[in-house]
């Protein structure tokens, strides 16, 4: 007789693997929460730390764009051509009379255009992230919370080690990939009590925006008065900011791995799935396949173009996002100023980065409560109007030399209002469609958001070569203000209020119609 055992089939191996996973998840679920409020508080503390790291990591390449451009584009070019240069915060002067300042100006503008092209191309990570993000439904929120935060740290280390443009490209693509999923947001919504969910989220997000003050602190610690190290010609001090944030991100990632617990929402959903028989799973799959005619990305796009309410919200979003580069390239705006009148020193630009997180955080804290009070549409109109007024005042302040703290608060007002407006428009799109295709319509809305963002990056790639640094901010102003005004006009004329929408609207019925019927009664 043969003692050989019959190899296990794929299905048998899968069942054994799933049985082990089920045992592990049920054990995790059974862990007691004796002091639930304390557990919730410390989880929100960890998530707030991760949110701060996410915001700082996302903003750091924008906040240091001027220094990065000088380091990876202008300085290598000058060295290659044998010129001895001394750099200040925003100008590079040749000691040789054989080269003109215009040549350096052209190199600076060319470098900014190349960085803009990288940012445009990096939007491909948004598409990849859509598939990557869905893996958290199988592997768990905690695992990807750790992986994404650690990935941010590793991406920032790439920036730290990069001394050329190729290194910058790799670092930016990696960073964009890991900051896009926003796993901490999913965690917050699944852990927070339903009654206080929006309040808790807006509060944590406001704290995260306030955490941008750390950029100011790091600039104070690592950047000297003239933008160089004590060794003349070393343009790479900005890299230490990336290292500091990378270390903080790595520490917080392991804190989350050790102390965070898996969300109950994921545990309940995954355990229920693992307990299903193969027949039950097959029936559910067949039901989902049958419903693809209602949902799915293509169906959502068709619905978007047929439903005027959703279509105009999406159009207003795409138009408003043409300002994206103008808002996020604030380092260049502060450095080169408006019509040549700018900061012109590290101290001034650094002081501005101290003040803007405060006004940005105030807007972030407030908009959720205001939206529930006066309505989504009115809130979006207020935010778009605020963006327009704050940016015009910011540029006037740069030109006329207003105090740094005023410039900083105006900059924070622009950034906070613009970011908040995106959240409000997203909410309006979700509240304007029936339940059975809401998730798909949100993907459609994200597509319009991405179109506006890509066009904005394309503008930022072309503008420096055409306008140069002197008129760069004028181009940003001429793009942003009309985009906000046009978006505001579309909202006022074409879009209905969505406050009070029943998100459990029956299949096939427009949620916005339920609001109208309720108001009529």
Model-derived segments and their meaning:
Residues 65-126:
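Extracellular/periplasmic helix-loop-helix junction of adjacent transmembrane segments
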Residues 116-134, 354-366:
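Central cavity-lining transmembrane alpha-helices of secondary-active solute carriers
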Residues 1-64, 84-88:
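Cytosolic juxtamembrane N-terminal segment immediately preceding the first transmembrane helix
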Residues 128-163, 374:
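Conserved MFS/SLC helix-loop-helix module at the cytosolic interface between two early adjacent transmembrane helices
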Residues 179, 196-224, 248-249, 445-457:
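Glycine-rich segments within core transmembrane alpha-helices of 12-TM secondary carriers
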Residues 150-163, 386-400:
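C-terminal ends and interior cores of transmembrane alpha-helices
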Residues 166-179, 404-420:
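Hydrophobic core of transmembrane alpha-helices in multi-pass small-molecule transporters
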Residues 61-63, 307-361:
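Extracytoplasmic gate region of multi-pass secondary transporters
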């Amino acid at each position: 007789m043969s003692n050989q055992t019959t190899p296990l089939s794929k299905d048998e191996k899968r069942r054994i693997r799933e049985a082990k996973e089920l045992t592990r998840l049920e054990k995790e679920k059974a862990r007691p929460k004796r002091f639930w409020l304390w557990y919730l508080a410390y989880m929100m503390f960890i998530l707030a730390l991760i949110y701060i790291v996410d915001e700082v990591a996302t903003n750091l390449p924008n906040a240091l764009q001027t220094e990065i451009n000088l380091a990876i584009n202008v300085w290598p070019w000058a060295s290659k051509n044998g010129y001895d240069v001394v750099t200040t915060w925003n100008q590079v002067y040749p000691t040789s009379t054989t080269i003109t300042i215009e040549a350096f100006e052209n190199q600076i503008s060319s470098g900014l255009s190349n960085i803009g092209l990288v940012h445009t191309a990096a939007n491909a990570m948004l598409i990849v992230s859509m598939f990557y993000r869905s893996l958290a439904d199988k592997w768990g929120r905690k695992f990807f919370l750790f992986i994404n935060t650690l990935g941010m740290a590793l991406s920032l280390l790439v920036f730290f080690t990069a001394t050329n443009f190729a290194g910058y490209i790799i670092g930016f693509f990696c960073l964009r990939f890991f900051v896009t999923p926003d796993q901490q947001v999913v965690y917050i919504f699944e852990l927070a009590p339903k009654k206080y969910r929006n309040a808790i989220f807006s509060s944590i997000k406001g704290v995260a925006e306030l955490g941008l003050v750390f950029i100011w602190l790091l600039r104070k610690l690592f950047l000297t008065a003239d933008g160089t190290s004590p060794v003349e010609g070393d343009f790479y001090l900005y890299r230490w900011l990336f290292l500091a944030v990378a270390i903080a991100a790595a520490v917080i990632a392991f804190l989350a791995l050790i102390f965070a617990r898996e969300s109950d929402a994921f545990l309940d959903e995954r355990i229920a799935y693992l307990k299903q028989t193969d027949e039950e799973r097959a029936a559910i799959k067949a039901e989902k396949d049958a419903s693809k005619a209602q949902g799915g990305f293509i169906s959502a796009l068709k619905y978007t173009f047929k439903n005027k309410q959703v279509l105009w919200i999406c159009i207003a979003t795409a138009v408003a996002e043409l300002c994206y580069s103008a808002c996020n390239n604030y380092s260049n705006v502060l450095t080169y100023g408006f019509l040549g009148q700018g900061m012109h020193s590290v101290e001034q630009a650094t002081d501005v980065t101290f003040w803007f997180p405060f006004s940005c955080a105030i807007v972030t804290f407030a908009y959720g409560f205001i939206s529930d009070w006066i309505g989504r549409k009115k809130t979006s109109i207020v935010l778009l109007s605020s963006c327009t007024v704050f940016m015009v005042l910011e540029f006037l302040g740069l030109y006329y030399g207003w105090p740094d703290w005023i410039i900083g608060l105006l900059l924070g007002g622009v950034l906070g209002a613009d970011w908040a407006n995106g959240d409000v428009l997203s909410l309006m799109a979700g509240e304007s469609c029936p339940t059975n295709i809401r998730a798909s319509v949100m993907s459609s809305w994200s597509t319009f958001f991405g179109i506006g963002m890509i066009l904005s990056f394309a503008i930022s790639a072309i503008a420096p070569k055409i306008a140069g640094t002197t008129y760069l901010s004028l181009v940003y102003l001429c793009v942003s203000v009309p985009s906000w005004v046009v978006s505001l006009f579309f909202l006022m004329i074409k879009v209905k209020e969505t406050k009070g929408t029943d998100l459990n609207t029956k299949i096939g019925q427009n949620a916005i119609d339920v609001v109208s019927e309720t108001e009529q009664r």
